Curated annotation (Swiss-Prot):
A single MF term (Gene Ontology): structural constituent of ribosome
Domain of life where this protein originates: Eukaryota
Similarity-based family: Belongs to the eukaryotic ribosomal protein eL22 family.
UniProt modified residues of type Phosphoserine: S112, S118, S120
Gene Ontology biological process terms, A to Z: translation
Keyword presence, Amino-acid biosynthesis: no
Annotated disulfide bonds: none
Name this protein carries in UniProt: Ribosomal protein eL22-like 1
One GO cellular component, as annotated: ribonucleoprotein complex
InterPro entries the UniProt entry points to: Ribosomal_eL22 (IPR002671), Ribosomal_eL22_sf (IPR038526)
Alphabetically ordered keywords of this record: Phosphoprotein, Ribonucleoprotein, Ribosomal protein
């Protein structure tokens, strides 16, 4: 039988970014207010407002970074972002899109103007 080695758990961190550039520059989105919303709503061990030293939320101009030392779902971050957009009546204009593996971006909905096919056909 092979000798057992002491297994030390790896210190892995989860790091996700939210790019809020376009809505913040247009003045319809307040990144400071959103950062405060995340601090209040993120759950750690089933409790909100329990970030402690486990989850860190940082804001740099138009980007918010969430760093977690426990497992943290990117999908949960998207859920909270959509919840904030709905609360502030921005859900009709903005959507949350994954731009790469660790980044979400807020983009405007693309509304195509189809003026030729208007409903005034007689």
């Amino acid at each position: 039988m092979a000798p057992q080695k002491d297994k030390k758990p790896k210190k892995s961190t989860w790091r996700f970014h939210l790019d809020l550039t376009h809505p913040v520059e247009d003045g319809i989105f307040d990144s400071g207010n959103f950062e405060q919303f995340l601090r209040e709503k993120v759950k750690v061990n089933g409790k909100t407002g329990n970030l402690g030293n486990v989850v860190h939320i940082e804001r740099l101009k138009n980007k918010i970074t969430v760093v977690s030392e426990k497992q943290f779902s990117k999908r949960y971050l998207k859920y909270l972002t959509k919840k904030y957009l709905k609360k502030n009546n921005l859900r009709d204009w903005l959507r949350v899109v994954a731009s790469d593996k660790e980044t979400y971006e807020l983009r405007y909905f693309q509304i195509s103007q189809d003026e030729d096919g208007s409903e005034s056909e007689d």
